[in-house]
């Protein structure tokens, strides 16, 4: 999931 990587940065 694309957003999963986004949250990983957070």
Curated annotation (Swiss-Prot):
Positions of modified residues (Methionine amide): 10
GO-annotated biological processes: neuropeptide signaling pathway
Keywords, in A-Z order: Amidation, Neuropeptide, Secreted
Listed GO CC annotations: extracellular region
Domain of life, source organism: Eukaryota
Keyword field contains Secreted: yes
PROSITE patterns for this protein: TACHYKININ
Cellular localisation: Secreted
Main subcellular localisation: secreted
Family per similarity comment: Belongs to the tachykinin family.
Role played: Tachykinins are active peptides which excite neurons, evoke behavioral responses, are potent vasodilators and secretagogues, and contract (directly or indirectly) many smooth muscles.
Name recorded for this polypeptide: Ranatachykinin-B
Species of the source: Aquarana catesbeiana
């Amino acid at each position: 999931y694309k957003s999963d990587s986004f949250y990983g940065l957070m």
